[in-house]
Amino acid sequence: MITNKVKTLILVNLGGPRTPSEIEVFLRDLFSDPFVFDLPLPEFLRLRLARFIAKKRAPKVQKSYESMGFGGGSPLVEETAKQAHALELALNERSSEQWNVKVAMACGYPNMRDIEFGKPNQDTVYLPLYPQFSRSTVLSTLAILETKFGECPVGSGGYVPHFGLDPNFHSISAKFIYEFFTNQLPKDQYLHYPEEKPNCDWRNLDLVFSAHGVPMRLIHKGDRYMEEVELSVKGIADELSKFGFNGGVHISYQSKVGPAKWTEPSTIQMISSLAKQGKHIAVYPISFVSDHIETLEEIGEQFKDLTWEMGGKSFVRIPALGIYPSFIQFLAEKVMHSDRKIQHCICREKGGESLQHCRFKD
């Protein structure tokens, strides 16, 4: 029975321009973030450089968005909204309280800095859709909320921590991959659903877990992102073996920007190497749970073309989890237990530093 009490879940994602007119704003927000664009410059110079880069990159990025067929924008906000709707249904089925689920973005719109998104507490819960901790995603989100409300939300009862190391996430991801290869997923629920499957037994192909790359300077500051990706992949691969998978398992990093050293190997390097060996290749977006430009265009088009150019025998893009029912139920369970307060600083443990208003700072 649902009571009159209403609780709010705010589903947070990185963001993406909904229309071409929002591209430069999105890029400006992205490159203005000190946890993303963290060059050792005075603040006024860093922000000026961020605006310059956003303006310079906008035309090139616009071409990529136009190629996806979503009106020149990104489908990420809409895909996140689908997940929000599914989560709202799941929470209201499971809970005696009424849940209202909103979508907020760290970059672009709807902007999580807006007044409609309230202070984290047991009645207003924030769930960032980042499986693995990184300074550039989770710590950035926490810093935005800290700036807005004057305290870090970790330990407030209104924050759901990253979930990529949870064994249940591993088993759900493995079953999703298995159901994809055995044609059990509803095609109409996934954007640009890959119709072509590898012309080999899926259990023997080379499976590349592609994560979004980060600059190595973040790793050197204490970011344990690479470790988290590796543990996520190991957990999923172990679960996949229960479905008979015996192929190659590889980890790589995509979406590098600029000349600085980033996490390696790059997915371009990995696919080139495997394709030259004549391998059957599948790519799974380990750090993404919502399809967008990096999964649809970068993985689905650029990496596919690279595979053929380098002599690969077949290529397939595995979709992101999206509204996969088991995943939505998994998230709902996390949300319902968010009032079990965290009793330590995950920012320092996973990202190398505490925020200024951390309630667990020594």
Swiss-Prot record:
Pfam families: Ferrochelatase
Subcellular location: Cytoplasm
Residues annotated to bind Fe cation: 212, 294
UniProt keyword terms in alphabetical order: Cytoplasm, Heme biosynthesis, Iron, Lyase, Metal-binding, Porphyrin biosynthesis
Residue spans crossing the bilayer: none
PROSITE patterns given in the database record: FERROCHELATASE
Keyword Metal-binding set for record: yes
GO CC terms in record: cytoplasm
Statement: the UniProt record of this protein carries the keyword Transmembrane helix: no
Record-linked NCBIfam families: hemH
Record-stated family: Belongs to the ferrochelatase family.
General function of this protein: Catalyzes the ferrous insertion into protoporphyrin IX.
Name recorded for this polypeptide: Ferrochelatase
Species of the source: Leptospira biflexa
Gene expressing this chain: hemH
